[in-house]
Amino acid sequence: MKRFFCLFLCLCLFLPGCSGELMKNPVTFYYPRREYQYGAEDGVISSEQREASGHADDLHYLLSLYLIGPSSDELVSPLPWGTRLLGVNRQDGTITLELTDTAQSVTDTEFTLACACLTMTTLSITGGDEVTITSGSRSVTMSRDSLTLIDDSTASTTEETK
């Protein structure tokens, strides 16, 4: 009985240490929720943490990883499968991203949502001020203070109902 108790005690002490390793260099990726409603309390965009795996300073690598899509089943990729990052340019606080042409498969509204997610991801990685995203003939520029990036619709609804 004492052996069983000692074995049980050892397992209780050591098994919690066997859980997944904490991320050493986490980055935050932003994606649209699979199911959302505009103006809902949860919002349209959510985030997940990913491991930078020694590439914390390699924006091209991290954004290429982003374009593969989310690991969570609750999130979806904002851009069609096969979208690639063609170029990244940093100048002062402005980051310019060039993507493959998505005009045939993404509406303007979907492209704007994708740009908001990609901008939030890029700004969280770089600490920049503004992101310009081009895809074919479309180009969207969003800054850190862009209203598109701020979902305060539930806050104003709550204030109006009081």
Where are these regions (language model features)?
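Bimodal "functional hotspot" detector
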Residues: 3-8, 12-13, 17-162
